[in-house]
Amino acid sequence: MRVFLDTNVIVYAHDRAEIKRHPAAVRVIDALLTESDEVVISPQVAGEFVNTMKRKGTPPATLALQIRGLSVFELSSPTLSTISAAWALCTAHSIAWYDAILVQTAIDARCDKLYSEDMQHGRKFGGLEVVNPFVQR
């Protein structure tokens, strides 16, 4: 199984101040890295992670280590075809533009699941299912 991570899951895994979500995010990422064939992020996710952690006041040396830590994930970059298909998703499914880019990048990377709290848990886009790891099951 191939999975795609949205920024919020990675941020919560690094931000101990997120008392409710931090432990869950760490457990989810650890499990995915152990059990999945590949855990994928995009440059958009990496950039949003850096921006968010910088805004939260993470010291530069710590952030540099966190950035290097992202190398455990496969990086999948969107193409112009991805952007075109994302626009079609955005208009057909009424989802936010940047969410559509993430969804299409995950689809292009042949992922089965997209872990995010920003979209409806269980929603499907073709063979890709959105999983909110913070939903009580």
Regions found by a protein language model. Give the residues of each.
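Hydrophobic helix-cap positions at the C-terminus of alpha-helices
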Residues: 31-32, 70, 89
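Acidic, PIN/NYN-like endoribonuclease modules and their adjacent C-terminal/linker elements
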Residues: 107-137
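Histidine- and aromatic-rich ligand-binding microenvironments
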Residues: 6, 41-42, 95-96, 118, ...
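Structured helix-beta-strand junction loops
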Residues: 35-36, 72-73, 93
